[in-house]
């Protein structure tokens, strides 16, 4: 089971909602098969951590390169993001 709910907006654009009640261990290191851009729809204290980097706030647009390991670090409240897959 995925740790988010997803709504498809177009072929490459999605809204994802990560629930605050999801256990932190569900947010595992992973990599994606395409470049992506994420942007939080609402202010948040959730963070994203890329391989070999310190966690950073999800502010503005965040580029996630294809095949780079990354993970979310849970904050307070739900996280609602706009996700664009650069395919």
Predicted regions and their residues:
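Ligand-binding loop in jelly-roll beta-barrel domains
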Residues: 65-87
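Short acidic-glycine-tyrosine-enriched beta hairpin
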Residues: 50-69
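Short, conserved beta-strand element in jelly-roll/cupin
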Residues: 31-46
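Conserved short histidine dyad/triad with adjacent acidic residue
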Residues: 13-32, 63-67
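Transition segment at domain starts
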Residues: 1-18
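Beta-strand residues in well-ordered beta-sheet regions across diverse protein folds
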Residues: 41, 48-49, 73, 82
